């Protein structure tokens, strides 16, 4: 009920029905004991009443629109805080329990004080390393992790930063001693807080963080901005200063390019369930079936090619099993940045580490106490190999933690086997300095960092114990280019086309079409875009519009076989067989032996009742393709309706001797009846009824041919009698 009342107030505000919204909010606040909120609302109401009074008196106020926006903004902000305050009293969600416990935090636990503790960590750690047995290490790690945790939770649960909070948060960005991981965690807390409640100061902080020198930090901030705008798409229009800052950030267009990349990464994450399903249902079972082939194949570098050459039969078996294609497809998806590990790691999120929400956001750190506990401070042997794998950009942070905990709990022999499988190359290669530095460089690329962070978020919203307490943006339509504040930033042809093509490749015709139409409206369409728009329309069964698009493509890139073929198909679908035929003939001129084209051209001629010409096409098809039942069927029917009964029967007999369908028995029955072989006709009709699965469907199908039979000279009065013979 609290959410419903709040939503109603917000709807009124969006419709600019400010007076109603304020009176609804007044009633909403009756249940809240928060006097500061009541006072803020009263002030906003009074200001609005004065404003309306001046207007009634005809007083011209050049600042009126600005003031109106400010009152509306203030009303909305009061509504936000009222909603949270009321939910704090009733909700069992983790977020609200955090807010209820905020009072217990000592006052000196502000951002600046926590910053000092975090900044001292690298030095404290260095001192411990000099001590025998790393004395005091546990206490240092614990103090650091608890401080980072308090900063995370207090930031997340603070829905409304004061000017002082904002200043202190800026101090974190400016600090040169703060460990980067702590700043990353703080950036995630700011994003989570914005998801619960819009706060201009936090949004402004993210705009600062996007320009931070460290890639980990600026990429997290970028994803944070995208999330904040997806959660509050229209909100920014009330804050011109924030909109102005966004435009300023994008002066050289680089911000838009980066945000567009995040947009694609978010869309790609929505494909994860499909990939998951493919892994579970196709790839893993296929691997299990082909385990012997896999066992005989050795991937990687061979010292001596003579002794270790592969048995070519294994390669063949591998390819013929279809597994080769599937693995290649997965590799391509992985290179593209798709989340191919979700199904593997989804099972590995039950470790105690993942019970705490903030741990899902902590960048992977070999110096995290939970990792040191399992592997020691300086990993050696297999663990050193593991740490190399963990420096690569193949896994997101959350999966790296899972991997470590899993490795720590399995026997040594299995661990070595798993590691060698995962690297899929000889381990020496990983140890090779040049290769491991290439891996490190890959891991430091902005696109890799942001993509892995999106994978971390995906896991949090899909797998964490408290996932049901959060709005899962991955389940919703993600359309960043439609957010008003991003219109000027993302609605640029070179960016829109990447999103359109992504949807097109992933077979989302409706989404791709909307974007192609936008590109066409921006006068930025070439033949390629009209072709793709046409194809999307065709997929949506909007054939007439598809034809329009294809015709435009044909003007821009004349006589392109693909366009002509699709034009023919669409004309055929709307039963304009004359136009379809015209285009099939154009394709035929370019590809005279294309079997499908011959068949469809013949079919169009048959529909136009030009049977002699149709037969020429079907005979040609029968000549170039041996045992072409499709051609035989067409020849049989065209011969029958054209009065060539012997020829018709000859072809139906060929069909009945190979792989007949119910319709073949039915049509052969027609020919037998027309040539006076009543008994044979009744027998064929009985077989047809059997194949159709009963008299009812048989009679329905027979009824469709009734007119043709009468035209061929069968007496209409005989039809009921024949039906009773069947």
Specify the residue positions occupied by each region the protein language model found.
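Conserved structural position within tetratricopeptide repeats
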Residues: 30, 518-521, 551-555, 585-589, ...
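Terminal, low-structured helical/coil segments at or just beyond the last alpha-helical repeat
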Residues: 694-726
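Start-of-helix register in tetratricopeptide repeats
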Residues: 3, 220, 494, 528, ...
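Alpha-solenoid helical-repeat scaffolds
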Residues: 362-557
């Amino acid at each position: 009920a609290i959410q419903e009342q709040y939503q109603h107030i917000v709807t009124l505000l969006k419709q600019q029905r400010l007076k109603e919204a304020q009176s609804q909010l007044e009633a909403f606040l009756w249940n809240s004991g928060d006097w500061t909120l009541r006072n803020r609302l009263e002030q906003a109401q009074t200001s609005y009443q004065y404003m309306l009074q001046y207007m009634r008196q005809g007083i011209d106020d050049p600042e009126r629109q600005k003031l109106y926006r400010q009152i509306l903004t203030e009303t909305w902000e009061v509504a936000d805080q009222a909603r949270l305050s009321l939910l704090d009293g009733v909700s069992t969600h983790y977020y609200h329990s955090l807010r209820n416990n905020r009072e217990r935090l000592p006052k000196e636990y502000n951002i600046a004080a926590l910053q000092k503790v975090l900044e001292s960590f690298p030095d404290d750690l260095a001192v411990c390393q000099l001590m025998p047995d790393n004395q005091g290490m546990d206490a240092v790690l614990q103090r650091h992790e608890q401080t980072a945790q308090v900063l995370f939770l207090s930031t997340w649960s603070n829905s409304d930063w004061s000017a002082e909070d904002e200043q202190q948060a800026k101090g974190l960005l400016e600090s040169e001693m703060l460990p980067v991981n702590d700043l990353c965690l703080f950036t995630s807390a700011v994003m989570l807080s914005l998801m619960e409640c819009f706060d201009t100061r936090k949004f402004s902080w993210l705009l600062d963080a996007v320009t931070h020198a460290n890639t980990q930090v600026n990429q997290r901030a970028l994803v944070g901005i995208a999330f904040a705008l997806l959660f509050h798409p229209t909100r920014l229009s009330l804050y011109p200063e924030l909109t102005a800052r966004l435009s300023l950030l994008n002066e050289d267009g680089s911000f838009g390019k980066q945000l567009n990349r995040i947009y694609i990464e978010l869309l790609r994450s929505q494909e994860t369930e499909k990939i998951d399903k493919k892994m579970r249902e196709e790839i893993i079972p296929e691997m299990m079936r082909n385990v012997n082939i896999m066992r005989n194949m050795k991937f990687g570098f061979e010292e001596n090619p003579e002794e270790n050459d592969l048995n070519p039969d294994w390669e063949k078996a591998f390819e013929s099993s279809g597994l080769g294609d599937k693995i290649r497809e997965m590799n391509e998806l992985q290179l593209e940045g798709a989340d191919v590990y979700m199904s593997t790691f989804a099972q590995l999120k039950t470790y105690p580490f993942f019970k705490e929400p903030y741990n899902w956001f902590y960048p992977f750190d070999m110096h995290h106490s939970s990792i040191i506990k399992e592997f020691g401070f300086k990993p050696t042997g297999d663990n050193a190999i593991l740490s190399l794998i963990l420096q690569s950009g193949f896994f997101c942070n959350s999966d790296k933690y899972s991997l470590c905990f899993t490795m720590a709990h399995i026997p040594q022999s299995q661990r070595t086997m798993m590691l060698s499988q995962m690297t899929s190359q000889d381990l020496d290669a990983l140890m090779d300095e040049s290769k491991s530095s290439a891996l490190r460089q890959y891991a430091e690329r902005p696109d890799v960092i942001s993509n892995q962070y999106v994978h971390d978020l995906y896991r949090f919203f899909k797998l964490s114990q408290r996932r049901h307490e959060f709005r899962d943006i991955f389940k919703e339509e993600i359309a960043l280019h439609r957010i008003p504040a991003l219109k000027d930033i993302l609605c640029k042809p070179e960016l829109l086309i990447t999103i359109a093509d992504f949807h097109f490749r992933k077979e989302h015709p409706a989404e791709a079409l909307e974007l192609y139409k936008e590109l066409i409206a921006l006068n930025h369409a070439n033949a390629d875009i009209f072709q793709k728009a046409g194809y999307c329309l065709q997929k949506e069964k909007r054939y007439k519009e598809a034809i329009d698009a294809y015709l435009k493509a044909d003007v821009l890139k004349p006589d392109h076989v693909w366009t002509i073929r699709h034009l023919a198909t669409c004309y055929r679908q709307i039963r304009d067989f004359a136009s379809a035929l015209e285009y099939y003939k154009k394709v035929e001129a370019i590809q005279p032996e294309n079997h499908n084209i011959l068949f469809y051209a013949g079919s169009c001629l048959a529909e136009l009742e030009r049977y002699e010409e149709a037969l020429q096409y079907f005979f040609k098809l029968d000549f170039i393709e041996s045992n072409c039942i499709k051609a035989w069927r067409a020849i049989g029917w065209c011969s029958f309706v054209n009065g060539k009964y012997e020829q018709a029967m000859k072809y139906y007999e060929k069909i009945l001797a190979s792989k007949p369908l119910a319709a073949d028995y039915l049509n052969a029955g027609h020919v037998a009846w027309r040539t006076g072989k009543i008994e044979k006709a009744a027998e064929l009709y009985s077989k047809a009824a059997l194949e159709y699965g009963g008299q009812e469907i048989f009679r329905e199908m027979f009824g469709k041919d009734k007119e043709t039979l009468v035209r061929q000279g069968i007496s209409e009065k005989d039809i009921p009698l024949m039906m009773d013979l069947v």
